[in-house]
Curated annotation (Swiss-Prot):
One of its GO terms (cellular component) is plasma membrane. It comes from Aspergillus fumigatus (strain ATCC MYA-4609 / CBS 101355 / FGSC A1100 / Af293). This is Crh-like protein 5. It catalyses: Random endo-hydrolysis of N-acetyl-beta-D-glucosaminide (1->4)-beta-linkages in chitin and chitodextrins. Residues 45-230 form the GH16 domain. GO terms for biological process: carbohydrate metabolic process; cell wall organization. Chitin binds at E123, R203, W207, T218. Residues 272-338, 348-364 have a biased composition (Low complexity). The active site is at E119, E123. It is found in: Cell membrane; Secreted, Cell wall. The lineage of its organism: Eukaryota, Fungi, Dikarya, Ascomycota, Pezizomycotina.
Length: 395
């Protein structure tokens, strides 16, 4: 009985450690440089061609391409191949055609993240063949643990599925192969104060949550210890498509509120002649975009079209499941030598130049610097949370 309650309590508290809690420059705390924008309404990448990586940064490990697309391989301790778009977009849609990595403890991740620690996630555990995880964070707030859900999907490690995040100022909708599995409305997220609403970039990566150097709770959440001798374990991404509701050359936070109303954007230009035939962007006229003036200006904000959001509840949708007590337990984190995305796809770093929040422990090092630095401090902090809960229950 004690174990039952301990497991349930840990399952509830573990998401506290899973948001990104570090940013190179957090606009909630100080004035930051503008974000480079996607100055087009759409962007597509066919990862069966190496040129599709032209608008991406390989921030950890190596990401080769092959017939099945970009390859994110975990073969040994510390492997956490990760790529980020080199641009941000502001409301719209992100579609990723992915086959998750197999292997107990191996995590495949699709993450949208912003500089002020807003985040929207997909995560697939290598040993879970029937479901995937959805999650979100606003402003790095990890004080509640009701954000994550598990939703059904068939054989994600054997089959390519299209994972979609449709993101507007009113709602976030997660879909698999065109079927909605979860909807989060603006008001569901603490009255909108924790709703993801600032310019995001897309991050893709895999890592070993089951690495033996990780905290016990992380390993349990990931499904168990990763057996590297049975690998390698590869996540494949065939293609990516992004719709940008507000094309712009750059996005600027006009104050420290972190609200979508505070975002100013500069210009929309036609960059349809992109780097290659397999990585292309298209610009169209939009009421959302400002003029091409170099002075940032607020313009009528556009949002992508989507189904009417559900009126209430943290998660809704025909296939969504409750987040109250997931079938696996544990937190997130990468190995102490690697970096990667996960439910803990957040950025963190030992650099003294960044800014951090007190919301929770960082789960990964700052990937934009291309570093695979140590995160012993952050995973230790998560482990302390687990220990504290267990101690209280034992008492």
């Amino acid at each position: 009985m004690y174990f039952k309650y301990t497991a349930a309590a840990l399952a509830a508290v573990l998401p506290l450690c899973s948001a990104q809690t570090w940013s190179k420059c957090n606009p909630l705390e100080k004035t930051c440089p503008p974000n480079k924008g996607l100055a087009a309404s759409t962007y597509t990448a066919d990862f069966t061609s190496a040129s599709a990586l032209d608008q991406w940064e390989v921030t950890a490990g190596k990401v080769p391409v092959g017939p099945q697309g970009a390859e994110f391989t975990v073969a040994k301790q510390g492997d956490a191949p990760t790529i980020d778009t080199d641009f941000y977009f502001f409301f719209g849609k992100a579609e990723v055609v992915m086959k998750a990595a197999p292997g107990t403890g191996v995590v495949s991740s699709i993450v949208l993240e912003s500089d002020d620690l807003d985040e929207v996630d997909w995560e697939v555990l290598g040993g879970d063949t029937t479901q995937v995880q959805t999650n979100y964070f606003g402003k790095g707030d990890t004080t509640t643990y009701d954000r994550g859900t598990y939703v059904p999907v068939a054989t994600p490690q054997e089959t390519f599925h299209t994972y979609t995040i449709d993101w507007t100022k009113d709602a976030v909708t997660w879909s698999i192969d065109g079927a909605v599995v979860r909807t989060l409305t603006y008001n569901d997220a603490k009255g909108g104060t924790r709703f993801p609403q600032t310019p995001m970039r897309l991050r893709l990566g895999s890592w070993a949550g089951g690495d033996p150097s990780n905290p016990k709770g992380t390993i349990e959440w990931a499904g168990g210890l990763t057996d590297y001798s049975a690998g390698p374990y590869t996540m494949y991404v065939k293609s990516v498509r992004i719709e940008n509701a507000n094309p712009a050359e750059s996005y600027t936070y006009s104050d420290n509120s972190g609200s979508w109303q505070s975002i100013k954007f500069d210009g929309s230009v036609d960059i349809s002649s992109s780097s290659s035939v397999t990585s292309s962007t298209t610009s169209t006229a939009s009421s959302a975009s400002s003029t091409s003036s170099k002075t940032p200006s607020t313009s009528t904000l556009a949002t992508s079209t989507k189904a009417t959001p559900t009126p209430s509840g943290t998660s809704s949708g025909s296939n969504s499941s409750s987040s109250a007590e997931p079938t696996t337990t544990g937190g997130t984190g990468s190995s102490n030598t690697g970096s990667g995305s996960g439910s803990g796809s957040g950025s963190g770093s030992s650099s003294s130049t960044g800014s951090s929040t007190s919301a929770g422990a960082s789960a990964t090092p700052e990937l934009s610097q291309g570093a695979a630095g140590s995160i012993k401090g952050s995973v230790t902090a998560c482990a302390l949370v687990f220990g504290a809960v267990a101690a209280v229950l034992a008492f």
